[in-house]
From Swiss-Prot:
Record field: transmembrane: none
Keyword vocabulary terms for this entry: Disulfide bond, Secreted, Signal, Toxin
Protein family (similarity comment): Belongs to the scoloptoxin-13 family.
Signal peptide residues on this chain, from the entry's feature table: 1-22
Tissue: Expressed by the venom gland.
MF (Gene Ontology): toxin activity
Subcellular location(s) per record: Secreted
Post-translational modification as stated in the protein's UniProt record: Contains 4 disulfide bonds.
Protein name, entry field: U-scoloptoxin(13)-Sm1a
């Protein structure tokens, strides 16, 4: 009985301290990589209504009030 309690305690300590990591983290990272591959890089043309710039960038440089504005900006 003591052996079962000790093994259960050891397992719980490993899970709580991160020695045994959850598989969900791996799934999130693959999802993140998929987004990174499909995002628009710096100085790439983007649409201000559908911002798809890579993380850390914003779709900037549009002026909706200007007559020559086409609605396309650059990821900066």
């Amino acid at each position: 009985m003591a052996y079962i309690c000790a093994x259960t305690l050891a397992f719980l300590l490993c899970v709580n301290t991160g020695i045994i990591q959850a598989e969900d983290k791996e799934y999130v990272s693959s999802e993140h990589m998929e987004f990174r591959e499909s995002c628009i890089p710096q100085d790439g043309e983007c649409d201000r209504m559908a911002d798809a710039c890579c993380p850390g960038l914003q779709c900037l440089g549009c002026n909706p009030l200007a007559a020559h504005d086409t609605g396309h900006c650059k990821c900066q």
